[in-house]
A protein has these predicted regions:
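N-terminal ligand-binding lobe of clamshell/alpha-beta domains
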Residues: 1-320
Length: 320
């Protein structure tokens, strides 16, 4: 069986189920586990993800307004070595390749298309089972799911009765956008009070005044596609928001930059690590570190002058 994974989280699931030898195509973003980087790349992005947050947002908006796709498929590879199974997603046309990106290239291709559409943590676990069923690895999938469920329950038990803090998670910085889908649920499970998006609902542009009115005690920066270092660096733009510097979380240094790709944006097994990261941030007295040093960065000082006008950046340091 030849499998194309057009979703980084699906690639992680396939490798976790021991199916790496059957994966013959992955996306340009599939970088975990490290071995995935050696698989043939069968997609391309038409948006420059190296640009700053506002520029990326502008590119995406412009392409949508023109009816243009954000991603493309290597049609030559599809014809030369067609897969038997294609795994894709239909949850977010911005985050990853979706069926509309390759629908026009499927003529003559008899591959079975498996579309994943998770909204909550339990949906992600069901996706693991779904991939296991499709690939003949149902038993391995169930074993993986049970292991993840045990870790989720361990966090809940550890934090039972713990005081809850108001949390604002930002999955984009400019414009600021609160985390959606499974992120609010993760905040709740990690002992926090989630922000303006209901669990299971997609992220959307929320007026800054509405987010500011939540008076968050903790702010977690988790931009899609950003490392903690990049999130920390580009967070300088937030100091230009009205009232940002006066927020309790900012004044007390309770602003954290985390690895969005690894632990929050991709609906795969590592979301459970993300839950453990949130639990560590919100309740360091109860939760020990579970990820390498540098996975969480904590605000130490704001930009010079309190804004980006001086071209300085806020300073973050590893959170032990």
């Amino acid at each position: 069986v030849k499998i194309w994974s057009l979703l980084p989280s699906a690639t992680e699931i396939l490798f976790a189920l021991g199916l790496e030898d059957y994966v013959t195509g992955v996306t340009h973003e599939c970088d975990y586990p490290p071995q995935a980087a050696y698989k043939p790349r069968v997609t391309v992005a038409y948006v420059d993800s190296s640009r700053r947050s506002a520029e990326i947002d502008a590119q995406v908006t412009e392409r949508f307004q023109r009816g243009q796709q954000l991603y493309g498929i290597d049609e030559a590879k599809l014809r030369e070595d067609p897969p038997d199974v294609i795994i894709t997603q239909d949850i977010c046309p911005v985050c990853a390749v979706s069926p509309s990106d390759f629908a026009g290239h499927m003529e003559g291709c008899r591959a079975r298309v498996v579309t994943l559409n998770p909204n909550l943590l339990e949906d992600v676990l069901d996706n693991v089972r779904q991939v296991g069923d499709v690939t003949g690895r149902a038993q391995e999938a169930e074993t993986l799911v049970r292991s993840l469920e045990q870790r989720i329950e361990a966090v809940r038990q550890t934090l039972a009765g713990a005081p809850r803090k108001r949390v604002l998670c930002l999955e984009w910085l400019d414009p600021p956008m609160p985390g959606g889908h499974w992120v609010p649920q993760m905040v709740q499970a990690a002992g926090g009070i989630d922000g303006p998006i209901e669990p299971g609902r997609p992220s959307r542009k929320v007026p800054w005044e509405e987010m500011r009115a939540l008076e968050p005690e903790v702010i977690v920066l988790m931009p899609c596609g950003f490392t903690p270092e990049r999130a920390a660096r580009e967070s300088a733009v937030l100091w230009d928001l009205p009232g940002w510097s006066q927020l309790s979380a900012v004044r007390k240094g309770e602003v954290y930059a985390v690895d969005g790709n690894s632990h929050f944006s991709r609906p795969g097994p590592r979301l459970v690590e993300g839950l453990e990261v949130l639990a560590r941030i919100l309740h360091p007295d109860r939760c020990l570190p579970t990820t390498p040093t540098g996975s969480i960065l904590k605000l130490v000082s704001p930009p010079a002058g309190g804004s980006t006008i001086g071209n300085s950046s806020p300073r973050f340091e590893p959170f032990a």
